[in-house]
Amino acid sequence: DHKAWSYQDGKGYHVVSGAYGNSIEPNLDTYTTINGFSPDLKFLGIGGANEIYKASVVSNRRTFVANVKLKASSGELEKFGDRIMFSEIGKFDTFLEHNFIDVSKGDFGEYVALESYADRILAFKHNLLHIINISSPTVSNWYLEETTRHLGVNHQFSVTKTKNGIAWVSDDGCYLYDGNSVRNLTDRKIAVSKASFTDSDINWNSWYRGSALKKDIMLGYDPISNSLIMMRSPNDSSTNSNKAFVYDFDSNGWTYNTGIFTDSSYYTNFITDFNNNLSLGVFDGSTAIEFKKFLPISLSQSDQEFYTKDIDFGFPSSIKKVYKVVVTYKSDGAETTPFKYAIDGKQSFSSDGGGTFTGNFADTSDKWDVLTLTPSSPVSCQSMQIKFDAPSAGIFEINDMSIQYRVINNKEAT
């Protein structure tokens, strides 16, 4: 136990010790000067019986923990679901009783996850996100920079750190905070519902909630390919829980994939291993847990389809006449009439004004080539959506696509 130095006339500062007597010379170093806080504090850390915290992150040489359960002076455990506590600088397991942040006390929300980026703490509840600025070395100068409602998370594994910022999956999309603002990575890229984008069953509402209506999306970041991997369910809590989306930060595009994960299996959270590989453990219910890593390499995929958004050319109310589409591509396989179109948001590629472009993919022997696609006659429309059926064999790449059209200035949709 600690005993403070005391002063006695004729002896000076000393500590009584039964074995060795008194210290004659005063000690310049005291408990307070060494540790930065008084020895009289009753609470120094979270580690008593049944004391816990449910979220944590290390930033600016401090540990931040949230959603804590602490023992009160009465000996009873008291829960602070909306409290964030922080350690002393460089003392990552020392939490003083007055080192806490109550950003929104009394809003009945509990913190689910913490992350840090660009001198900010991102504190997630189920229904909102707090962005707290901790750039100042003085604690009293920390402040709540932004509160964003309806962008919370349901699990810690729905949040991940990337070199581009903090990414997370909320109820209505996948978001990124880049140190300046929050943006929706899925906006106008993944359909909200079947009717909102294409005639495909791949849409956010059915994928996010799954057959069991459980919201447990797991998110990981692969630093090698600079990609996000968004898995439907690590707990097999839905039919086809292996369904996944992959986001490429370099192209800003999403890819739907059912071959990365195995349905009816159970997965650990993602980690980044010693070799910078995104890894996780998988259990199929019968054998031992097997650890696997994500490898961003090309593999065979069947029945691939590509859809553009409904393109209005910047003039949504005007009638346009579309003459041709020019595609720069290379392919190891041939494909007959792979491009189709739908008009005016109707999502029909065979009727209601939709149809097939004339023009075939050729085997270019891994060299870039240009394909000109034409409709049977110029298409008059407000907007156009293009669908592409990938070759059934081989590897293909599309570099760019341009549409030749003319706005009919004196004709507007009625």
Residue ranges and their predicted role:
Residues W5-V16, D29-T33, G75-I101, N133-N141, ...:
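Surface-exposed loop/turn elements that mediate protein-protein interactions on large endomembrane-trafficking
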Residues H2-K3, R61, D82, N127, ...:
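Repetitive beta-architecture junctions, highlighting loop-to-beta-strand starts
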Residues W5-G10, V15-N22, N27-D29, S302-T414:
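Non-cytosolic beta-sandwich-type ligand-binding/adhesion modules
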Residues D1-E76, K91-F100, R188, A195-T198, ...:
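Disordered, low-complexity "stalk" and linker segments at domain junctions of extracellular
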Residues L70, D107-I297:
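Beta-sheet-dominated scaffold domains
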Residues T63, L129, C174, T268, ...:
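Viral virion structural and adsorption modules
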